[in-house]
Amino acid sequence: MSTSHATPRILVIDADLDAIETARFALWRSHTACRFEWFDDAEVANASLLTQALCRSRDLPALILLDPRKFPGTEGYELLRTLCVYQQLAHIPLVLFTESPLCSDFAQEQDSRIWYAAKPALAADHMDLVTRCVQKRLRQPEFH
């Protein structure tokens, strides 16, 4: 197995390039061992992930951080649908960012496939949230 396949792939999908760069910097600063990849276009991300699923790629993301709200129309939600419907993608853990006051903030005790988190307005808080989400996921048994 090559080193690139042994290193967990973290995929951020967000229309906000600043949020993507903040996440990248947070993981770099925390020395989190991962391959950071991103899309700022939900349709392109959807096509890429769907192609990987249909080709039965073994190099799927270990975790996807997605903010579906800022994409035009329903693109972000169509991507979310793809991630939930296709069997090859349905096992990938997701962190969905939302501004809804009804969402539960990411907490250490959450253990479901989909985590919900209110996206912090401050970059430092966003960096902390991304780092905690990714590190918690990478500590789970399936990655050891």
Residue positions per predicted region:
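Hydrophobic/aromatic residues positioned on beta-strands within the core alpha/beta folds
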Residues: L94-F97
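Conserved phosphotransfer microenvironments
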Residues: A42, R58-L83
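Acidic, metal-coordinating helix/loop segments flanking the phosphotransfer/catalytic sites
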Residues: R24, W38-L63
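Non-catalytic signal-transmission and effector/linker regions of two-component phosphorelay proteins
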Residues: M1-L11, A15-T32, C55-L60, W115, ...
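Short, conserved "switch-loop" micro-motifs in signal-transduction and mechanochemical regulators
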Residues: E99-P101
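As written
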Residues: A107-A118
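A generic structural motif
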Residues: H31-F36, D40, A90
